[in-house]
Amino acid sequence: MRSIQSPSSHAAEQESFFSLAALQVGLPLMWASPRPSPNLPDKEDSSIGSADVVRTGERLARFAPLLAQLFPELEAAGGIIESDLLAAPRLQEALNMPADTGTLLVKADHALPIAGSIKARGGIHEVLEHAETLALQHGLLASHEADYRVLAEPTARALFSRHQIAVGSTGNLGLAIGVMAAALGFQAVVHMSADAKEWKKERLRKRGVTVVEHAGDYAKAVAAGRAAAEADPRCHFVDDERSLSLLLGYAAAAPRLARQLVAQGRRVDAEHPLFVYLPCGVGGAPGGIALGLSQIYGEHVHCFFAEPTRSPCFLVQMLAGTPELAHLGAHPSVYDLGLDNRTEADGLAVPRASVLAAEVVRPFLAGVYTVNDEALFRHLHLAATTEGFRIEPSAAACLPGPAMLMGTAEGRAYLQREQLEHHMARSTHIAWTTGGLFVPDDEYARFRVRGALTS
């Protein structure tokens, strides 16, 4: 296997091992988990087992006929919200990935309908679960075998209209939850941070969603939303930092991906390792997906989270409790390390990670790498020019993953330690592009110009 180097990488940065000093000054880097565990999350003592993921998938299937009725764009798929697993040979070549390093595929959540991002998975699931609970409690659904299309009828909408669903968001989660909640008739409120893009706020308002703007960052928007919800017994707050329902909604993507891999003839085993690169904000989406994949593939899947260099909250949480960060307590933020949480990747601009997601993935997460904004725009432009993928900056964080794994000393040491070096030619690399479908044309054009200028 040859070492590869991303078009965005700098040799001096790529050759070094992880260091806290490099993290604190915002250098792009790779951190490999020191002890990936063979004790994977489907053990009897785990609070989240594969049966929970199966039940989540069953719930999404029960709602599919209703979703097909509510959203014409879902009719062809029978109400199932899913993205394609796409070959990307031109992008692989542009990323300097020779054939002996494996095959690159793109999980195209940037094109997911309704929300246009990965947040359609977890966010919509939690809204549907809450609607199901209310409908069962009030006798609108006799059982899980009922026809869920009754939830589009006036009686159900009258019930839902007396209840509120709220969320704190930098943008995409708010879009997913706001659009779905409003479509069912709920009062929908989205608390948005200063990082949120104006077009996302306008898209919500046009769908009847109340947008509450906050001057602070993501964490402050979530805290404000949580406090407001606690004062209203009829308000269900979708808590991105603590929600098991969200996490399971994301985890339900794993069995679907497994079926797509089988359909494409891609094996995953000791001789055919699977590497997955997932953009990470608070951690719920990549955490849920990593959980689901680990339940299916065990030690043969290697999930790496991607974060902005100035907002690496999940990596900071992974380092919590180490001697270097022990003085910061159990739940440190990027501010504690002197970082400013400023990035064009609005969906990843999070100062403090979800403790729930961190503890779920800690036993099996392969690693975390960081990417600067310049590289995000460069890779966004590369995805467009090679494959025609229309992604937003946050989604582009997944694309430097192979280079960070195979082109850094830290990444190569991980491959050597896990005895993967001689299996790379038969490996599969999945870059999970997390959003972009609904980015306005003028905004996307600016992204492309900035990416072209840095290429």
Swiss-Prot record:
What Pfam families does the database record attribute to this sequence? PALP (PF00291)
Catalytic activity as recorded in UniProt: D-serine = pyruvate + NH4(+)
* Gene3D superfamilies, sorted: 3.40.50.1100
Protein EC: 4.3.1.18
The entry's keywords: Lyase, Plasmid, Pyridoxal phosphate
Q: Which cysteines are joined by disulfide bonds?
A: none
- Required cofactor(s): pyridoxal 5'-phosphate
Which sequence positions carry the modification called N6-(pyridoxal phosphate)lysine? 119
Query: Any coiled-coil ranges, and where?
Result: none
User: Which is a GO BP term held by this UniProt record?
Assistant: D-serine catabolic process
Q: Which InterPro entries match?
A: D_Ser_am_lyase, Ser/Thr_Dehydratase, TrpB-like_PALP, TrpB-like_PALP_sf
EC category: lyase
User: In its UniProt entry, what is this protein called?
Assistant: Probable D-serine dehydratase
Q: Please state the gene responsible for encoding this protein.
A: dsdA
